[in-house]
A protein has these predicted regions:
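Helix-loop boundary and gating motifs at the non-cytosolic
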Residues: 2-48, 199-206, 210-238
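Structural signature of the two symmetry-related core transmembrane helices
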Residues: 70-84, 264-279
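Juxtamembrane intracellular "pre-TM" segments in multi-pass secondary transporters
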Residues: 1-2, 175-206
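Helix-loop junctions at membrane interfaces in 12-TM secondary transporters
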Residues: 3-5, 87-99, 281-292
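Helix-to-loop junctions at the C-terminal end of transmembrane segments
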Residues: 53-67, 150, 248-262, 347-348
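Cytoplasmic helix-loop-helix junction between adjacent transmembrane helices
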Residues: 100-134
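Multi-pass alpha-helical transporter architecture, strongest
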Residues: 87, 165-177, 359-386
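A membrane-interface helix-boundary motif in multi-pass transporters
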Residues: 148-164, 344-365
Length: 386
């Protein structure tokens, strides 16, 4: 790898390593802290809900700064002490306040980082998928390591994640500097992102699929460890299998994107997620749940690679940070808020997290049926002919 691509890959590895610790075990941290029922749902939903505000604001700020890297450094730097504070909290009120503050910074790291990396790779022969591969490998290894190190002491999770974020801050310092456009004004500003070619149907499909993924990321750890024999260390293996399953697509994803485009590839995601969540709703064995994780490689990573590359190609330079923020706002903030609330309500009413996965089957099937006629009729959406 050339030096800029190597620095970008290092950032990806550190970010997804930190995210493996936080995202994979936050629900177990809350559960071990005595939080359950509606209070657990409120804590889990506050994070994506507040990111609906924070992500577009930081995306806009990044585009207006002389150096776009500064916004990334601020969001990573602020997240570290907030995670440490979360580790000190004992009661629900303190956790709720810190979680809300954390949501103003940490969810913005991924879209800001993606925007900088995609811009850095424009003149590089190294495709984005190869760089993103470092993130999947790191997520797999760190998930396994975190599961083994935490054991049943999930209260230690914030400290472990904060340590990973400290390393990530160093990785962010090494990213190639990218100039913002503080004096460029585009009529309509941030809202112009929604007027980019085919942005609305693509974002609509992503929102539905990410709603289902939001339920998975929030409740899978609780569901898995509730199965007979579903230990914390085995949960780490589940995350490892899921991350490893992303590798084939990341090796081929750039070529597949150019050939089939974002819309058609995400229809494959819709079909795979319908099957995946249908199986998760039915199985009662942790070994079967481990096997189902092999379908993970056709879900999140396909959506994010396709949307990141498409928006990077069609957005003007002064809107690139905002464009990535919109992807994250729609695909994370809005959709995961729905996934956590609706899925949590159903699982609470029926007394089973598996029932929530049944609802997500309906969401993914609706996405597939509703958007297949749209994207199969349109030309290939790869940003070159849009």
């Amino acid at each position: 790898m050339k030096k800029p691509a190597l620095r970008c890959a290092l950032f990806m590895a550190l970010y997804y390593g930190a995210n493996a610790v936080y995202q994979g075990y936050i629900s177990k941290f809350y559960q071990q802290s005595g939080i359950s029922g509606s209070r657990l749902i409120l804590l889990l939903v506050s994070f994506p809900l507040l990111s609906i505000l924070s992500q577009p604001l930081w995306g806009w700020a990044s585009d207006r700064m002389p150096r776009r890297n500064v916004a990334l450094l601020i969001t990573v730097g602020a997240s570290i002490p907030l995670l440490c504070l979360l580790g000190l909290m004992k009661g629900y009120a303190g956790m709720a306040i810190v979680s809300c503050l954390f949501a103003l910074f940490y969810p913005c790291v991924q879209p800001l980082g993606d925007s900088l990396i995609l811009q850095s790779l424009q003149e590089s022969p190294i495709p984005y998928g190869r760089v993103r591969l470092a993130g999947s490998v790191s997520y797999a290894l760190c998930s396994l390591a975190a599961g083994a190190l935490l054991g049943r002491n999930y209260r230690a999770m914030p400290w472990m994640a904060a340590g990973m974020l400290a390393l990530l801050f160093g990785g962010a310092l090494l990213l190639p500097p990218q100039a913002g456009r503080p004096h460029t004004r585009i009529r309509g500003g941030f809202w112009q992102v929604f007027r980019l070619p085919h942005a609305l149907p693509l974002l609509g499909l992503v929102m539905l699929l990410q709603a289902a993924m939001g339920y998975f990321y929030s409740y899978f750890a609780l569901h898995f460890t509730s199965l007979n024999g579903g230990r914390g260390a085995l949960l780490g293996w589940a995350y490892l299998i899921g991350s490893a399953s992303e590798i084939p697509f990341l090796l081929l994803g750039d070529r597949l994107f150019d050939r089939f485009g974002a819309g058609r590839l995400m229809l494959v995601s819709a079909a795979a997620l319908t099957l995946r969540f249908g199986l998760l709703a039915l199985v009662r064995s942790p070994i079967a749940a481990l096997a189902i994780q092999a379908l993970h490689g056709l879900g999140f990573v396909v959506m994010m690679l396709c949307m990141a590359k498409y928006m990077s190609r069609v957005a003007p330079p002064a809107l690139r940070g905002s464009a990535q923020a919109v992807i994250s706002m729609a695909g994370y903030g809005i959709s995961r808020t729905f996934g956590v609330l609706a899925g949590g309500f159903i699982s609470n009413r029926l007394g089973s997290i598996g029932a929530g996965f049944g609802l997500m089957v309906a969401v993914c099937a609706l996405a597939l049926i509703g958007f297949a006629p749209v994207f199969l009729r349109l030309p290939v959406l790869n940003g070159k002919n849009s």
